[in-house]
Amino acid sequence: MSGVHDVLVVGAGPTGLACGIEAARAGLSLLIVEKGCLVNSLFTYPPGMTFFTSRERLEIGELPLPSVNVKPTRAEALEYYRRVAETYRLPIHYQERVITVEAPNGIFRVGVEDAHSRPKNYTARRVIIATGYYDIPNLLNIPGEDLPKVSHYYTEAHAFYQRKVAVIGGANSAAVAALDLWRHGAEVTLIHREPELSRHIKYWIKPDLENRIKENSIRALFETEVKEIHQDWICVQRKTGEVLRVANDFVFALTGYRPDFEFLEGAGVQVDSQTRRPACNPETLESNVPGLYLAGVIIAGMDTNEIFIENGRFHGKQIIADISRKVQEEVQAGTLAAPAL
């Protein structure tokens, strides 16, 4: 069938690239579609960021990640994944957002829009969704959240020197941002609705933040929720019911992110109403939609602390092993021509 790919991967992050590598190794015709740039989520990380994990755990395709540090930097990771894509000659279409995934006659029709909102369609026998979770922040849903002074993504600290900055959240992203802002001369207030910092904060970061809070270098408001955001101040409420008005120039609402469950449901994937975990065979990672596979953090639902690059990078082997087996069965049954090796 002309123009039909054996495998179409949605997402060119590390997990999507790992899936593409395995498909290419299996001799399957492949297309990867990415809404942004290569490893788009990693590109949006703060420029000076260092990963929490070792370089070996970021490696895919048996290619080593060279780094002068035990934990690689953002710049080193971006260079590495460019080399991966080039080494394996992965066919990637950038700036194409997948809008629909349908299989009306057993062949998937994938509808996309390019950077200029022009529609186009691709067809594939199997689809792998590896879209991650970094695109959709967990919103506060409060007045003023849409003000220009509010961001759900931390960038870098210099612009906030001698400014009053609120960091909302109590996990790794909030901890790193609060410390970085303070070290670059910002007046930082950390606001967290829980009574203490998250236990998931990395062991070398948490004591640093706790000490800065203890010495009052960083103001911390625990068991506190932001109720309103205004141009020059924010309104917060303590667990006791006390309402405070905190002077403020900028807000980083680092309250986590979630996968695009609506996109999955639009593709026919069943999503649990409580855990938001999509229906997925744990052995093959095939969803309830035949031929539609899920890879990476999206299979964990709301529990985004369960899967990271270091374990999601192995999903491609599981998925392509199942696809290859089914392709061979179809070839033997005479229902599919053998893939061109």
Question: Where in the sequence are the language-model features?
Answer:
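Short, glycine/charged-enriched secondary-structure capping and boundary segments
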Residues: 23, 45-49, 107, 141-145, ...
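Short glycine-/acidic-enriched loop or helix-start segments at secondary-structure transitions
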Residues: 19, 42, 103, 138-140, ...
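Beta1-alpha1 glycine-rich phosphate/pyrophosphate-binding loop at the start
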Residues: 5, 12-90, 175-204, 272-274
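A non-catalytic, amphipathic alpha-helix used as a structural packing/dimerization or gating element
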Residues: 79, 211, 314-318
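FAD-binding core/adjacent interface of flavoenzyme oxidoreductases
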Residues: 1-10, 25, 40, 44, ...
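Rossmann-like dinucleotide/flavin-binding elements
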Residues: 2-5, 9-35, 153-198, 283-331
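A Rossmann-like FAD-binding core segment of flavoenzymes
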Residues: 87-114, 121-124, 183-275, 331-341
